[in-house]
Every structure is written in C-alpha cells, then in structure tokens.
Amino acid sequence: MSNITGLTNKIIEDAKVSSKEIMDDAKKKEKIIIDEKVSIAENERKLILSKAEEESKVRAGRIISNANLQVRDMKLSAKIEVLDNVFNAAVEELSRMTGGELLNFIKNTILLLDIDGDEEIIVGENEDRVTTEFINEINKELNAKGKLGKIKLSQKRIKIKGGYILAKNGIEINNTFESRVKSLRDDMEAEVAKVLFS
C-alpha cells in the first residue's frame, strides 16, 4: 500500500509541477498576448490621434483659406466701388460743362467723325443748349469739309448726363458722356487702379 501511496503522491507531485509549469507558461503567454493587444491599441490610438490632428489641420487650413478668399473678395469689392466712384465722378464732372464747353465738344467731335453729314443728333431730355442755329453752324462746317451738311436735331430725347448720339438708318454713334467714360474705363481701368491702389 505504501507503494500506492508513494505512487499517488508522486503523481500528485508531478501534477503539481506540471500544473505549475502549465500555469507559468499560460501566464507568459497571457503577458505576451496582453502586451501585443496593448501595443496594437496604443498604435491605433496614435493613428487615430494623428488622423484627428491631420484632419483638424486640414479643416483649419480650409477655414484660413476661406477667410483669405473672403478678405480678397472684400478688398476687390472695395476697389471696384472706388473705381466706380472715380469714373462716376468723371461723368458728373463732364455733365457740369458750361454751355460753350458742351457746344465745342459736340461740334469738334462731330467734325472729327467719318460721317456722311445727314445724320440725326439726339441729345439729353433736358438739354436746351443744342439749338437749330447751332446745328446749322455744324452743317456749314461739314459742307466746308465736303460732307452733306444736313444734320438734323432729333425730336427724340434720351435720359443721359450729357453728350449726344448721332443716328442714321438704325446705326448709332454714341458720344454720350456715360459711353465715352465707359470706353475710357475699359482702356484705363488697370492704370487708374495702379495709381489708386499702389
């Protein structure tokens, strides 16, 4: 019986040693698995933080870019408003011409035009300085230049700040102050902007 007791004790001892080895091995494997999972979780945390930081930088960049665009648009709008004011002031200044200055402007510009001389002159609705006598003077000078000299003052009046339109057969030569300043603006806007904004 002592053999059986000894054998049983030996089996129990071996089982204890074996279970201790199994437990130690399991603890080592458990530590390795936990360390791996912690490492993976830490890497994912870093990746998530990195992505969040990158996204916030991109978002911040977009916000800054949009703000810069808005500022640029506001500056551009302000510059356009200033240019509008400058060219509108030019039209207003022209519209304050004296009667003599206006008549000289009309006569001189008509005499420079390549026209037949039988057009109709249309002036502003409140313009009373352009008279039939004045048109007759222009016609005499047109005759002297070999033109027909039959320009007529139209009964039709238009809403303009000053100047005139010559019309014949549906074709118009627009020499209103607004049109002349617009034409000058197209040619000079970059130059004027350079003077104003540099």
From Swiss-Prot:
GO biological process terms on file: proton motive force-driven plasma membrane ATP synthesis
MF annotations from Gene Ontology: ATP binding; proton-transporting ATP synthase activity, rotational mechanism; proton-transporting ATPase activity, rotational mechanism
Highest taxon, organism lineage: Bacteria
InterPro entries the record matches: ATP_synth_B-like_membr_sf, ATPase_E_C, ATPase_V1_Esu
An example Gene Ontology CC term for this record: proton-transporting two-sector ATPase complex, catalytic domain
SUPFAM superfamilies: F1F0 ATP synthase subunit B, membrane domain (SSF81573), V-type ATPase subunit E-like (SSF160527)
Keyword Nucleotide-binding: no
Annotated coiled-coil segments of the chain: none
This protein's UniProt keywords: ATP synthesis, Hydrogen ion transport, Ion transport, Transport
Function comment: Produces ATP from ADP in the presence of a proton gradient across the membrane.
Family label: Belongs to the V-ATPase E subunit family.
Entry protein name: V-type ATP synthase subunit E
Upper lineage: Bacteria, Bacillati, Bacillota, Clostridia, Eubacteriales
